[in-house]
UniProtKB/Swiss-Prot annotation:
Coiled coil: none annotated. Plays an important role in signaling via the cell surface receptor PLXND1. Mediates reorganization of the actin cytoskeleton, leading to the retraction of cell projections. Promotes focal adhesion disassembly and inhibits adhesion of endothelial cells to the extracellular matrix. Regulates angiogenesis, both during embryogenesis and after birth. Can down-regulate sprouting angiogenesis. Required for normal vascular patterning during embryogenesis. Plays an important role in ensuring the specificity of synapse formation. One of its GO terms (molecular function) is receptor ligand activity. Disruption phenotype: Embryos present defects in the patterning of intersomitic vasculature. Disulfide bonds join 105-115, 133-142, 270-382, 294-342, 519-537, 654-729. This is Semaphorin-3E. Glycans are attached at residues 44, 126, 175, 330, 596. It comes from Mus musculus (Mouse). Residues 1-25 form the signal peptide. Residues 581-669 form the Ig-like C2-type domain. The keyword Secreted applies.
Length: 775
């Protein structure tokens, strides 16, 4: 891109950020809660399956609610996992490539790892069998797996005697882009169907309708596509009018100024397409495609586009003809990386395919709207009763209709999202968004779509979006950030079970399940529950628990929930806080050494809460807000005094503000010790310490060689007298009073106060104990 182009991109991107910011809360990029892998395990909210062989190389997953199993395809293996707990009771099928095939594959120049048998296809074939296809050392083949009826003895057996060639059903390359859908006994697949990965095509095979595909080497149909998803969606009650939709990205022919421009497409064809009689024989005669747009409106009509589709999710509704389509997109710019989620209604998609065709007279002409006569039956329509019933199959269509469809596969009108803009935009660059799953939830104040977004670091974001019709702004609320795997790993597959309230997540090396919610984690007070804004959770008068819109579990008198506004003050007015949990303010005593640094720690549970510090210098003195400067700094961890003064002594109040709800989280009394008194301590007779009956014990839970947290912090902020301060702290901790406390049993000493135990167990961050406070 030329320098001028770089400047334009920078300006557009800056405007995008400016445009998007007003619709968000104070910290839109922060999740409200951040849970580590360790915390998820301790909450019993997750379960992890890892192959006993040490590798998995997951490529596909299939959720089977009927069999209550999750089927996983990897390298040389197919696994059957328990939906209740994926780490328990797994079964496996070992299905490697033959030694002869592997040797041939390597001799042709492929890497030995690529010459394994990677399972790429898993579909329900009927109630007792699965269809599976695998790469077979660059010689794809398919077979059936017998799983039996749900009521029978569990079965999991590969019927290898029914193996068939898999060309056109499964790619040769294990890493090639690929999608497939089984409709009846017909397998529809979008793939690269040759050994060298050059022949991109959409196939139908296996069933009674016969083998059919897109034309070879016709860039008007497919130009270097990356297949993302495929679904069968009916248009009406006539099954002969059913259509297959393929979602993919490709190089756009109509972007004449840049041959490398990527667009996202929706391709459509009739399930019962038989091809033409004289033209397009055994080729799709109803294939059409339209551009799928996801963009943010910009200055002077110049939009910022997210052109590359990463994932697509179809959310079923009560009407099977009108599911909601969610697309996860990213930018194709080499300068900036951004991601967006757009939502599409089927009415917009059908409108584009029923609209005008795109047309180009010749190489010297531009693409334009076709204004000539359109033949009958309309190109792209199915042979059905809805279409007049005049034609039994597409083979009966007139040649001019087939010829027109062949020359005009592209629709002129693009498909635009709901509200004509994304529901979610992420431009912080923290991680790349890769996978998307959606659950629709009924809450007290309406219906919400909860987005679960998988990233390239093993993080899953749980997000809701709220559209304000008056201002036309979209508020995104990141409810949780979940670290699914212990070690960062890209999420490559996600399956969702609304019935079980579980999300199943696959990486290359492991499969995890995680519950949608854990309501009592939010806190034991009404305000805690309402501030969470989680549509799965509500205050029932006793605790924060699962919200049930109707039925026996509903407690209409006591439910308190406000997802749209999070107005805890209004919702919880008159509610008694259990154990006065919210009224109770944690009190601490802290010491600071004059002219050195001190941190008053306060980390609210919610990362979206604003923290305000107040100080009171005497009992009868009014509280004042702490003024920060180059000496007193407000940090995420608390209030940092770079150089403590005697005048800083007082009582400090850490208050959080979230949706206008104010809560005092912590009260810290700071006592400042004069530096010369600390110096005097080191001139005392050291013999006194040698006569102590009990030596100063090491910090609980700290292994030998582990550096206490405060040492790292003191070195980080640059204490001028680090060694003396360290010695002073050890002397303070080793007083006779402290030794008496340490004589208690370890379990009693660690959590002498039940309230402290509860607070510690629900703490957001795990770290070494800080036995620094004397009361």
């Amino acid at each position: 891109m030329a320098p001028a182009g770089h400047i334009l991109t920078l300006l557009l991107w800056g405007h995008l950020l400016e445009l998007w910011t007003p619709g968000h809360s104070a910290n839109p990029s922060y999740p409200r809660l951040r849970l580590s892998h360790k915390e998820l395990l301790e909450l019993n909210r997750t379960s992890i399956f890892q192959s006993p062989l040490g590798f998995l190389d997951l490529h596909t997953m299939l959720l089977d609610e009927y069999q209550e199993r999750l089927f996983v395809g990897g390298r040389d293996l197919v696994y059957s996992l328990n939906l209740e707990r994926v780490s328990d009771g797994y079964r496996e099928i070992y299905w490697p490539s033959t030694a002869v095939k592997v040797e041939e594959c390597i001799m042709k120049g492929k890497d030995a790892n690529e010459c394994a048998n990677y399972i790429r296809v898993l579909h329900h074939y009927n109630r007792t069998h699965l269809l599976t296809c695998a790469t077979g050392a660059f010689d794809p083949h398919c077979a059936f797996i017998r799983v039996g009826h749900h009521s029978e003895e569990p079965l999991f057996h590969l019927e290898s005697h029914r193996s068939e060639r898999g060309r056109g059903r499964c790619p040769f390359d294990p890493n090639s882009s690929f999608v497939s859908t089984l409709v009846g006994n017909e397998l529809f697949a979008g793939l690269y169907s040759d050994y060298w990965g050059r022949d991109s095509a959409i196939f139908r095979s296996m069933g009674k309708l016969g083998h059919i595909r897109t034309e070879h080497d016709d860039e008007r149909l497919l130009k270097e596509p990356k297949f993302v998803g495929s679904y069968m969606i009916p248009d009406n009650e006539d099954r002969d009018d059913n259509k297959m939709y393929f979602f993919f990205t490709e190089k756009a022919l109509e972007a004449e100024n840049n041959a490398h421009t990527i667009y996202t497409r929706v391709g459509r064809l009739c399930v019962n397409d038989m091809g033409g009689q004289r033209i397009l024989v055994n080729k799709w005669s109803t294939f059409l495609k339209a551009r799928l747009v996801c963009s943010v409106p910009g200055m002077n009509g110049i939009d910022t586009y997210f052109d590359e589709l990463e994932d697509v999710f179809l959310l079923p509704t009560r009407d099977p003809k009108n599911p909601v389509i969610f697309g996860l997109f990213n930018t194709t710019s080499n300068i900036f990386r951004g991601h967006a989620v757009c939502v599409y209604h089927m009415s917009s998609i059908r409108e584009a395919f029923n609209g005008p065709y795109a047309h180009k007279e010749g190489p010297e002409y531009h693409w334009s709207l076709y204004e000539g006569k359109v033949p009958y039956p309309r190109p792209g329509s199915c042979a059905s009763k809805v279409n007049g019933g005049k034609y039994g199959t597409t083979k009966d269509y007139p040649d001019d209709a087939i010829r027109f469809a062949r020359m005009h596969p592209l629709m002129y009108q693009p498909i635009k999202p709901v509200h004509k803009k994304p529901i979610l935009v992420k431009t912080d660059g923290k991680y790349n968004l890769r996978q998307l799953a959606v659950d629709r939830v009924e809450a007290e104040d309406g219906q919400y779509d909860v987005l679960f977004i998988g990233t390239d670091t093993g993080i899953v974001l749980k997000v809701i979006t709220i559209y304000n019709q008056e201002t036309e702004w979209m508020e995104e609320v990141i409810l949780e950030e979940l670290q699914i795997f212990k070690d960062p790993a890209p999420i490559i597959s996600m399956e969702i079970s609304s019935k079980r309230q579980q999300l199943y997540i696959g990486s290359a090396s492991a499969v995890a399940q995680v519950r949608f919610h854990h309501c009592d984690m939010y806190g034991s007070a009404c305000a805690d529950c309402c501030l969470a804004r989680d549509p799965y959770c509500a205050w029932d008068g006793i605790s924060c628990s699962r919200y049930y819109p109707t039925g026996a579990h509903a407690k209409r008198r006591f439910r308190r929930q406000d997802v749209r506004h999070g107005n805890a003050a209004q919702q919880c007015f008159g509610q008694q806080f259990v154990g006065d949990a919210l009224d109770r303010t944690e009190e601490r005593l802290a010491y600071g050494i004059e002219s050195n640094s001190t941190l008053l720690e306060c980390t609210p549970r919610s990362l979206q809460a604003k923290v305000i510090w107040f100080v009171q210098k005497g009992r009868d003195v009014r509280k004042e807000e702490v003024k920060t400067d180059d000496r007193v700094v407000k940090m995420d961890l608390g209030l940092l005094f770079l150089r403590v003064r005697k005048s800083d002594a007082g009582t400090y109040f850490c208050q959080t503000v979230e949706h206008n709800f104010v809560h005092t989280v912590r009260k810290i009394t700071l006592e400042v010790v004069e530096e010369h008194k600390v110096e005097g301590m080191f001139h005392k007779d050291h013999e006194e310490e040698r006569h102590h009956k009990m030596p100063c014990p090491p910090l609980s839970g700290m292994s030998q060689g582990t550096k206490p947290w405060y040492k790292e912090f003191l070195q980080l902020i640059g204490y001028s007298n680090f060694q003396r301060v360290e010695e002073y702290c050890e002397k303070v901790w080793c007083t006779d009073k402290k030794r008496k406390k340490l004589k208690m049993s370890p379990s009693k000493w660690k959590y002498a106060n039940p309230q402290e135990k509860r607070l510690r167990s629900k703490a957001e961050h795990f770290r070494l104990p800080r036995h620094t406070l004397l009361s």
